[in-house]
Amino acid sequence: MSDTLLRNRNSRRLLSLLLLAVYLPLLSGCLFGEKRRTYSPPEEELLRAKADPRLRKEAETGGSEPFAAIAVFNNDVFLDQSEALGRSSLTVLNEMGRTAILLLSPGQIVPLLKDPSLRKAAWFGPQELLARLDPSLELDMLTRFGAGTEDRDVDLLLRFVDVGGAEEERRVVAAGFRVVTRAGPNWLVTGPMTGLPKLLESDRITYMEKGS
């Protein structure tokens, strides 16, 4: 076999490997449903104006699994939004004043944002994780989002599966909270309500309630 033929064969093999490296991730994305949704410029503007970053990500790349989201309206949810929410087939998991926890799928995000009575919306988490929230904490969270004070620090009592340690503290800090005191598996922390979704992601936390 001549040197020229050998070089040509090696070049073709290298080209094939390069093409495979480029197209394999794209093919995998198609096979596993990792397809980015496209929106019109007005819809993109709505996502930037009314949705938090995690909710925008769900709208663009989410699948079909429902999740809980916080929605803040201009008017009282029970008195003024019940009929509209019913027509849109959205499930209200809880509500207080102008704020509601809705069960959404990614495809319902933009239609919700198009409602002129909606002020803002934020991703919260899988519905089953709401069971870790004390009812009074959930209502306080709704009240604070409605009043626009969700960024202010609040005291929370976190109950862990055991006494916890450095890894648990890193998760608490990553959610925007700081540890005030510890008593065995019970930690008193302080931070903004906007950090609750990240706290809920930790399987080490079994329950959350308002701090005394």
What are these regions (language model features)?
Residues 1-11:
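N-terminal secretory signal peptides that target proteins for export/translocation
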Residues 2, 20-21, 121, 174:
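Residue-level detector of intrinsically disordered, flexible termini
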Residues 3-5, 18, 47:
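A subset of signal/propeptide-processing and intrinsically disordered low-complexity segments
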Residues 9, 17-18, 59:
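Generic detector of short alpha-helix boundary/capping microenvironments
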Residues 9-11, 24, 40, 208:
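Compositionally biased, intrinsically disordered low-complexity regions enriched in proline and serine
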Residues 17-26:
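Bacterial N-terminal signal peptides
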Residues 30-212:
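Autoinhibitory N-terminal propeptides
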